[in-house]
Amino acid sequence: MGIQDARWPSEDEETHLLDSSSAEQTRGEKCSDSTPDVHIVEEYEDRAPATCQAPSTSTDTPVLSSSMICPPRQRVAHKCTQCGKCFIYRYELLEHQRLHTGENPYRCSQCGKAFRRTSDLSSHRRTQCIKAAYICIKCGNSFQSIQEKFRHQCVHSVQKFDCSQCGKSFKKMHLLGKHELTHTQNRIFTCRQCGKVYPGMSELRSHQKIHPPELSNQCMQCGKFFSSSACLTAHEVRHRQQRTQICARCGKAFKNKHDLNLHMRSHTGERPFQCTYCGKRFSVSGNLNIHVRTHTGEKPYLCSDCGKAFISAGELQIHRRTHTGEKPYKCSVCGRGFTMASKVTLHMRVHTGERPYVCSECGKGFSRGSELKKHSMNHTGVRPYACQLCAKTYTCLNHLKRHLKTHSVIQNQSV
């Protein structure tokens, strides 16, 4: 089945269009009868426009428009002739007017459902339309699951390189060359720890990650372990590389001025990059790009073993360790291995007794910020997790789950 949408929204369009009508109401408010259909709105620092003020929202997370993030000197306000609401951008007015006309120009080619906005269609295809969620955008083939879609190799118009000895095909010439070595070379690579044999060094190294590393090959500066002393020596060279840029506040050294400036934001609190969906700010643009994917649902990094998708390469790398068994970060006290460096830091507090997160109300200390957050709810009275069956509330999700089991037990006893 082919994709037949007359117009598929681009990423730029989805970035401009908001996903909820509440954002539309935040931008536009009724103007007075004397207000012309198009007029100039002056914007100044620390106050809203004089002619069209955006009403405040009662939610904790405000919806921020692009004009609030980077306010220009002047904006042209566009007024709806039917209800009097004003909008800064013309595309916002056109989108709003579809509420009056009932027009839904964006139609899903798989199920026929129509939508008023491109972002609604995009969200529908990602999360609701079963037929559209598993379609190859290159060839139009549909699949029953995301795993089948991932395993599907779309080879249309892709040049293939065939092995002359066994007929196996490859997409790239260097992959074919690497494969042909398995026919011409008699050399094999054996794991010294378990005796398994592999045709190439890369396959052997990938296998060796499942074995616990030798304790003698540990970097004294960062704690990482290596399979050989040669790898450890090469790694230690990176620590000894000249770092001339020194932070005046904490003494940390960096290779160049750019890295130092990025680091300084951790001291100054500067976060110049803001999310247009929820208003959250970031010190690095790359972190913002990854965060935006939590709103758009984009997960471009796929695991080649199970097909699971992730929003960043870092998350995929950590997930891959569940398949390989690799735990490169070791505790220097007890030798326990971890898949992430941050988990080692948290674990070390078990040995040191460090509790850096202190409650401002009672002075109690905690090793994790999440534990302090849960504890603070006892002082504030906030209990965000409510049971839908008996209206009991809890400060912790696990406590709610444990409570819900009591309902299932009572129901089974009554039967």
From Swiss-Prot:
Entry's transmembrane regions: none
The record's Pfam families line, in alphabetical order, gives:
zf-C2H2
Keywords for this entry? DNA-binding, Metal-binding, Nucleus, Repeat, Zinc, Zinc-finger
List the residue ranges of the region (Disordered). Answer: 1-36
InterPro entries listed in its UniProt record? Ikaros_C2H2-ZF (IPR050589), Znf_C2H2_sf (IPR036236), Znf_C2H2_type (IPR013087)
Its annotated compartments are:
Nucleus
List, in alphabetical order, the GO biological process terms annotated in this UniProt record: regulation of transcription by RNA polymerase II
Q: Indicate whether Metal-binding appears among the record's keywords.
A: yes
Which top-rank group of organisms is this from? Eukaryota
Q: Which GO terms describe its molecular function?
A: DNA-binding transcription factor activity; RNA polymerase II cis-regulatory region sequence-specific DNA binding; zinc ion binding
Zinc-finger ranges (C2H2-type): 78-100, 106-129, 134-156, 161-183, 189-211, 217-239, 245-267, 273-295, 301-323, 329-351, 357-379, 385-407
What is this protein called in UniProt?
A: Zinc finger protein ZFMSA12A
